[in-house]
């Protein structure tokens, strides 16, 4: 029920200077699409938005023959997504940024009935770097939060984590940004900055137009966890990220950071690729990635979106730690996992695909007509799906309305602050050369070469424009461009 998962503030009613506002923050965001919906196939309802693309010859494996090749020219679409992973990056920059990139990749893969991530981006906003051997005149000494990594440590480790996951998964990062900002306000003396950083992960993926819309999970369909085992990591990450800095305990801060495993995510993606390549016979009816809240969020969302309930067998959930309690098993945020609704008639075909790709998976439950969620150690009958009639001692036994019923709408009141009067800039006392050197040496302006060359920018073979331009290959490109296929000239 965190802000991360339920967006209570973004859906709240707002009063500004005593005047009721006509739209919530989310309604303001959605208003752009409402005014200009053309060419958009899906927006604000799935793990990523989908936009109409150009006809393309997608390079993929034929599900019948098992051979790879470029098929006939077919309509295509592309998925786009940007999200942040700020709190984990503030606590542990490398795994925080790595799992941020990984979570965005999973969102593209879990769009519709399966998409394919193609190219990515990474971005960072931090406070002053305060490099010990390179002090800068604009960096004033002040106390920093000891429970968060310093801006310098974030920029040393975070970009490496994001680049490592992208490359090890098999996706290039072709653009991004880096900003360092910190300023003392003239009247209050408060220092504004990014002690809690922004870690931005985004990307573009490909998806077949006929796979854009999820199909409802039907009673009797299997609920499958695809990917790695559960471990006691990332517990409470979605909740911790929704708290103000310093409100959570130090133990929760470190427990809430996930760990990355790009190889496992690649195996999952190969399974998804093989499923959507089957076209109308795609065994995946609906998909969600496992992120904030772990299975406690992903499985109920999968069922709720289809208007069904479910019986979930705790004993069937893969785990690497046999000591996990039901709460830990249900709520941990172990990465590289997807929750899939698999058509019962295609379950054997799905299992065969997973075996071929050596990708772990488990049937952990079944959808039911009754909109009720039962989570327990359910005895299995002869089928690979838990008995939906089981009503033993349960860890969770609640109606779905209790999770997704309309909660009281939050009311937020705010006032516009007075515009600060900044002192007039005295240019007469400036040394032009010194001013120029300061501007050029500021991290937001200086070369980003060290953030670009840490990763392979050509992996996948569909990059038409990366960060490096010109005869001296300087990272000055103002865009990244990917191609739709290996023979055409269209792309994003």
Regions found by a protein language model. Give the residues of each.
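Glycine/proline-enriched, intrinsically flexible loops and inter-domain linkers
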Residues: 1-381, 388-492
